Amino acid sequence: MEDSFAPDNVRSRLLFSGLKELETHGVSDFSLRRVAQDAGVSCAAPYRHFKDKDELIGAVIGFVIEGWTLLSEQISGIFSSDSRSLVIELAVAGLRFWIANGNFRTVISASQTLDKAPLSAFEKPITDAAKRYMSDNGASYSDTLSFKLLSMIYGAVILVDGGYESAERAAESLRCVLSSEL
């Protein structure tokens, strides 16, 4: 069944299927058999790429974090000379990333039982931008700004999930609030 696919392609399909499995069934009911079936490979295929389900879950978490890292690095490069815009755009991108990747929340929740690294990887670019913004404006950094930024992002995600706000309106509202506050 999987012979027509390159090994890297099979691994990628297993990661995508693992992400869907986490979103649908969570960590406690995670099934390598369902992942293999969804990826269109044999039940033995996951074991050729991952030692066990924990290793696959860890790889899925790494895959999601890598997506955010690439996005945040691109934004940091674009707004490298304007720390205010950098804070705003990273916060809006973070919100859009969480909304567009509902499975990211599942992965983060799942990973909290493993370690805090995935959540830290999401928060670090935003916190670093807040530190730089404070420094550029002659203020000493306190974690209050980061707390406010992250609270607004997480709160907006909850509002969108609850149907109180559309994703686009939440992103624009966040941008508007940050533009007036910074």
Identify the meaning behind each predicted range.
Residues 95-117, 158-159, 163:
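Amphipathic alpha-helical segments used for helix-helix packing
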Residues 100, 150-168, 179-182:
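Amphipathic C-terminal alpha-helical segment
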Residues 17-25, 67-78, 152-159:
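Solvent-exposed, amphipathic alpha-helical segments
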Residues 39-50:
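Short hydrophobic/aromatic patch on the recognition helix
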Residues 22, 31-32, 42, 53-64, ...:
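Amphipathic alpha-helical segments enriched in hydrophobic/aromatic and basic residues
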Residues 66, 85, 89, 109-147, ...:
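Amphipathic alpha-helical packing segments from all-alpha helical-bundle domains
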Residues 1-25, 32-38, 55:
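Basic, helix-initiating cap at the start of DNA-binding domains
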